[in-house]
Regions:
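Short, positively charged patches
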Residues: 1-143
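Glycine-biased, small-residue-rich flexible motifs in mid-sequence functional cores and linkers
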Residues: 1-3, 84-270
Length: 272
């Protein structure tokens, strides 16, 4: 893909009032040539008949384009791959989802289309029971599927223990982030994240400078669910991000599993 088209697709994700559904509609309407919308903003009524003036007006966006140019320069300097949804390296499982990101930023060595990919999620307040499950299950999984990639969200609790268990068993593991690749949140996981770029990778749809705000974690969860064959919940209370991920996985018609919990354990109240 030419750099200008990549730039414009990234800019499309940053425009106000478009959203992911609208972005996909515009991508289809232009047959994958989003650049024409930015190159000829005053002619959008001819390019896409029926487009509302309000939507058309946001494509006159030089500041957005400048910011996205800076982001692509940042990516190049930091060995970050920018993947659009029609790139061969873009996760094919995720591409099947209606709300798949138009652009992903990826730093790592793992094939995002590996034959077997499993997502593991759970509470941020992991118990010894949950930590033990992570270590034992991932070890047994390696014996069954030596090429499997473990995906999680690099958060406290089950997420980080799943990543570390995979690394300990010399397996590839990918962390999906709720912010840009200019930082690691939480910062105490930087060392693990650095290891993962050499044995797995870090993946996000967010540009650098993006804060790890609450709504970004929900968006992150759909990538965790969509990139894998199945999602496994280790520990979770009645509510939480891991259950949101499980619900998203089911909406994508992906397999979803949960480990049985201990009686009267508040972190074992899930029913899938």
């Amino acid at each position: 893909m030419k750099n200008h088209e990549l730039l414009c697709r990234l800019a499309l994700t940053q425009l106000p009032g478009i959203g992911i559904a609208g972005a996909h509609k515009l991508l289809d309407a232009t047959e994958g040539k989003v650049a024409m919308l930015f190159d000829h903003p005053k002619d959008l009524g001819d390019i896409i008949p029926g487009i509302s003036p309000k939507i058309a007006s946001v494509f006159d966006a030089p500041e957005v384009l400048r910011r996205c140019e800076a982001e692509l320069s940042f990516a190049e300097k930091n060995h970050i791959a920018c993947l659009t949804c029609d790139d061969e390296a873009y996760p094919s499982r995720l591409r099947e989802c209606d709300d798949a990101p138009l652009v992903l930023f990826y730093r790592g060595i793992s094939d995002l289309n590996q034959r077997h990919i499993i997502s593991m999620v759970g509470t941020r307040n992991a118990t010894d029971y949950g930590k033990d499950i992570c270590m034992r299950f991932i070890g047994e999984l390696k014996e069954l599927l030596p090429d499997v990639i473990i995906v999680s969200g690099l958060a406290y609790g089950i997420d980080i223990h799943a990543h570390r268990a995979a690394l300990q068993h010399k397996m590839e593991t990918i962390g999906v982030l709720a912010h840009g690749l200019d930082r690691i949140y939480p910062s105490v996981h930087r060392r693990t994240a650095a290891e993962m770029t050499q044995c797995g990778g870090l993946l996000t749809e967010f540009m650098s400078g993006t804060n790890p705000d609450k709504q970004n974690f929900v968006k992150r969860n759909r990538i965790v669910a969509g990139i894998s064959d199945a999602t496994i919940v280790i520990e979770s209370a009645n509510k939480g991000g891991s259950l949101i991920t499980a619900e998203i996985a089911e909406s994508y018609h992906r397999d979803c599993f949960a480990f049985p919990g201990r009686i009267n354990d508040m972190l074992s109240l899930i029913h899938i």
